[in-house]
Amino acid sequence: MRDKTTREKALCYIVRDGQLLVFRHLDYSYEEVGIQVPAGTVKPGEDPRDAALREAREETGLTAFTVVRKLGVAHYDITPYRPEIQRRHFFQLALHQETPDRWTSEEDQDGIGKPIRFECFWIPLEHGHVLQSGQGALLGNLIDQ
């Protein structure tokens, strides 16, 4: 078995009126990527809080986010997808702009490669158990704290 690398990740729980902001990839099957919250890799030297705000903007196309609080850190082993342990920093974000119930956005990947297309939408917070790859692990902290 290959050695596993550890990667720092930032995940965003954006909640409004009891609804959680999620997305699906338009160019990949549901079976492959499921429903996700905005999340991504923390760049070298980047604060996880800043990474959370950046990922929320990049993946939703929205801009008016603020960090409410850090909810905690959890580790997730994504093997067999690839030999990697993700050290995930979970943040609750507030959104300060109106949105439709559903919209599409694109992440341009810093101009490298084809843009990634997303469909963003809101689901009831209590349906957060459907999130892909353990992304719902700290949803309970939204209520418990």
Feature annotation, model-predicted:
Residues R7-L11, Q86-F90, R117:
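Short hydrophobic/aromatic beta-strand or adjacent loop that forms the aromatic wall/cage
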Residues I14, Q92-A94, F121-P124:
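Short, well-ordered beta-strand micro-motif
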Residues Q19-E58, L62:
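Conserved Nudix-box catalytic region and its N-terminal flanking loop in Nudix hydrolases
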Residues V42, L95, L125-G128:
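Hydrophobic pocket-lining residues within nucleotide cofactor-binding pockets
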Residues L62-P100, S105-D108:
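Active-site segment of metal-dependent pyrophosphate-handling enzymes
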